[in-house]
Curated annotation (Swiss-Prot):
GO terms for cellular component: plasma membrane. It comes from Bacillus anthracis. It is a multi-pass membrane protein. It is an enzyme of class 2 (transferase). GO terms for biological process: heme O biosynthetic process. Keywords: Cell membrane, Heme biosynthesis, Membrane, Transferase, Transmembrane, Transmembrane helix. Converts heme B (protoheme IX) to heme O by substitution of the vinyl group on carbon 2 of heme B porphyrin ring with a hydroxyethyl farnesyl side group. Its EC number is 2.5.1.141. This is Protoheme IX farnesyltransferase.
C-alpha cells in the first residue's frame, strides 16, 4: 500500500467510525458473542459430568461459578489477543473493520495487555476447580492464539481444522472441573461434535465472505480452491457427525433421535447445495442451520437428563 493510498484509507476509516458506547467496544474487543456461545458448551460439559458421576449441582455451585467465570475469562482473553494479532487485516474485511482495535477505540497495547491479564485471571479461576480444567483451558488458548492466529490462519487452508481444535475444548473444561480423569466416552463425544461441527460452520461462513477473505489475503478453502471443493468438504464433515449420537446412548433414545434428525436435516440441506445455483444464499442457509443445530443439540443434552 503506497503512502497516498494509506492516507486515503486512514481518512475513510476515521470518517466511518460508528458511534458506540464503551460497553459495546469492550464486548467487541472480547468477542462477547463467541464467549456466550461457548459458555453453553462449557456448562453442558459441567452438567453432564455431574450427571454421569451422580453428583448434585447444588453441592458444586462454587465449582460452577469458578468454571463459568474462569472459562469465560480465558475465552475473552484469547479473543482479545486475536483482535490484537489481526489488527492489520481486520480493516480489509467488512465484518471486522469496526472492531475497536481497528477504529482506534482501543490501542493495540491495551488489547495485548488486557487480553493477557484476563487470560491469566481465567486460569486462576479454573485452578480453583481442578488442574485438568486449567490444562484444557491452556490447550484451547495455545491452539487458538499460536497455532491458529499466529501460524496457520494466513498460510494454510487447514487453518479451519486447526482452529476447530480450540473451539472443541470448552466442553472438556466444564467436564474436567468435575471429573479431571475425563474418562467417560461422552466427554470426548462432546469434543468430537464441537470439532467436526465447526468445520462446515466456518466453511459456510467463508463462502459467504469469500471476497472479504480474498481481499485480506486469508487462504480460506473457497478462496484457494473454489466453491465446489468447499461444498464437498462441507458435506464430508457434516456426514461425519451422523454416527456420533449412537456413541452417546447414555443420554437416552430421545436425545439420539433429536440428534439424528438434526444431522439428517443438515445433510439434506447440504446435498441441496449441489443443485442450487445461488451458492452464497445456500452458504447462508447452512451457516444459520449450523447455529440452530448447535443450540438445540446442546440444550437437548441438558434437558434429557431431567427425565
Amino acid at each position: 500500500m503506497n503512502h497516498a493510498t494509506s492516507e486515503l484509507h486512514d481518512e475513510s476509516a476515521v470518517t466511518s467510525i460508528p458511534e458506540t458506547t464503551r460497553l459495546q467496544d469492550l464486548k467487541a474487543l472480547v468477542k462477547m458473542g463467541i464467549v456466550n456461545s461457548n459458555t453453553l458448551t462449557v456448562f453442558t460439559g459441567f452438567w453432564l459430568a455431574l450427571h454421569f458421576n451422580g453428583l448434585s449441582v447444588m453441592d458444586n455451585l462454587d465449582k460452577l461459578f469458578f468454571t463459568i467465570v474462569g472459562s469465560g475469562l480465558v475465552m475473552a482473553g484469547v479473543c482479545c489477543l486475536n483482535n490484537y494479532i489481526d489488527r492489520d487485516i481486520d480493516p480489509l474485511m467488512e465484518r471486522t473493520k469496526t472492531r475497536p482495535t481497528v477504529t482506534g477505540k482501543y490501542k493495540p497495547g491495551f488489547a495485548l495487555t488486557f487480553g493477557l491479564v484476563i487470560l491469566l485471571l481465567g486460569f486462576v479461576f479454573l485452578l480453583l476447580t481442578t488442574p485438568m480444567a486449567v490444562l484444557m483451558g491452556f490447550i484451547g488458548a495455545f491452539t487458538y492464539v499460536v497455532l491458529y492466529s499466529l501460524w496457520t490462519k494466513r498460510k494454510y487452508t487447514l487453518n479451519t481444522v486447526v482452529g476447530s481444535i480450540s473451539g472443541a475444548v470448552p466442553p472438556l473444561i466444564g467436564w474436567a472441573a468435575i471429573d479431571p480423569s475425563l474418562g467417560h466416552p461422552i466427554a470426548w463425544m462432546l469434543f468430537l461434535i464441537m470439532f467436526i461441527w465447526q468445520i462446515p460452520h466456518f466453511l459456510a461462513l467463508a463462502m459467504k465472505r469469500v471476497d472479504e477473505y480474498r481481499n485480506a489475503g486469508i487462504p480460506m478453502l473457497p478462496v484457494v480452491h473454489g466453491f465446489e471443493i468447499t461444498k464437498r468438504q462441507i458435506m464430508i464433515w457434516t456426514v461425519c457427525l451422523l454416527p456420533l449420537p449412537f456413541y452417546m446412548s447414555g443420554l437416552g433414545i430421545t436425545f439420539m433421535v433429536i440428534a439424528t434428525l438434526l444431522n439428517i436435516g443438515w445433510i439434506v440441506l447440504g446435498f441441496y447445495g449441489f443443485r442450487k445455483k445461488d451458492d452464497i444464499k445456500w452458504s447462508v442457509q447452512m451457516f444459520v442451520y449450523s447455529l440452530n443445530y448447535l443450540t438445540i443439540l446442546f440444550v437437548s443434552m441438558i434437558v434429557v437428563t431431567f427425565f
